[in-house]
């Protein structure tokens, strides 16, 4: 395996707060999938593979990156403001999706799921743009990281289904 990848991802448990079983499962799957297959390179660095600690502090997203042995590489701090609208839309469509699973036809569920994936893709592209020049990630890595960003945001007082 190459050096431009993540070998571990840690999420600040204090930021996460309490979450429901659906959100917790989605987070675990995203981390597992992320570790299994990802592209993650810190621009200007060649010390990978990397360990990522993801947290939220004062309405900012914190990417603390270390080498596998634990040497600090870089900490990137991004404003969450550009993500607020897409995260809000994502939670709204997730609420609709979980409701549809209980009460709707397969066709309706599929339509809502397509919309959910579309919003998720939008958030993933936004993340790639915001990390441009800092961290090189592929689209699939961005999708999984966006899932984790939503989990952090949910821990700050808004969770799907709430």
Swiss-Prot record:
The cross-references to Pfam families, in alphabetical order and at most eight, read:
UPF0262
- According to the UniProt entry, where is the signal peptide? none
Name the source's superkingdom.
Answer: Bacteria
Please give the InterPro entries that the UniProt record associates with this protein. Answer: UCP032146
Q: List the disulfide bonds.
A: none
Q: Which family does it belong to?
A: Belongs to the UPF0262 family.
Q: What is this protein called?
A: UPF0262 protein HNE_1347
